[in-house]
């Protein structure tokens, strides 16, 4: 199948947001296996994938609702839940190290208990479980914009399932256990083990409902922790290859290369929080996303300096909790960008 290179310009008079992707293919539509087939996408990475953006500020400001109203969008579906796209999520935020995180996750004293799948209509509040100023579950991640973008292409009878397993502060080169390179069968040493285990748990839960899960894509957002590492490209290729091989039995035709990989560049804008060290990661992401017209590797270009979406981070008053996290409108746009790649490349079954 041949990829088509497309680029969307940001014209505020015409569109609310734009998608600038490293490549934007148009493969043949995915086959409709039968009425038991449901599409599945796995979302993983670190805090901006886990969801570290306010939808409502601790001071009570309805940041996401206000953004929707400004853009003339209906807020009710994302507030009440999108029934055609269900999400189950697992992860934790650990500012003080892996050991503490693994023994004291935000929602329960047993992190393993949180690995029980719980698919719900996608809505606000599916971000980090951290409590800020006494307020809890006030965060969201890319799952929201993604779900709202593909909602009408799915159905309540055969909803798209999103499996989100992401860990704040994690990286390929971390030494405290929060490491994506290790393949130990030990949850205290390997994030890939946790990702693998949770993904299987969720796939089996779908099967128990009588549906047949078909894994269509692996969505990644990571690099803030180790974006300057010269081996970032190698680490990424290994991760994607291992993921595809691990879950090939759930791929279309059991072909691992039919599991799409959708990445995103990390922040490169100006300001005190500029992640200038992320150049190596962004170069790797763009290279992997652009190198072939025949694969299913994609990359959202979120950059400022490379003519991308120009997504902003770190403005607390605009929802960017802490230094490195997307502002509220930008976190939604990021999810929308993932969703548009899925739609533009026919990665969904006929509903």
Describe the function of each predicted region:
Residues 28-351:
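Cell-envelope and extracellular/periplasmic
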Residues 18-21:
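C-terminal motif of bacterial Sec signal peptides marking the signal peptidase cleavage site
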Residues 23-25:
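Bacterial signal peptide processing site
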Residues 1-9:
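Bacterial N-terminal signal peptides that target proteins for export
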Residues 8-16:
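Sec-dependent N-terminal signal peptides
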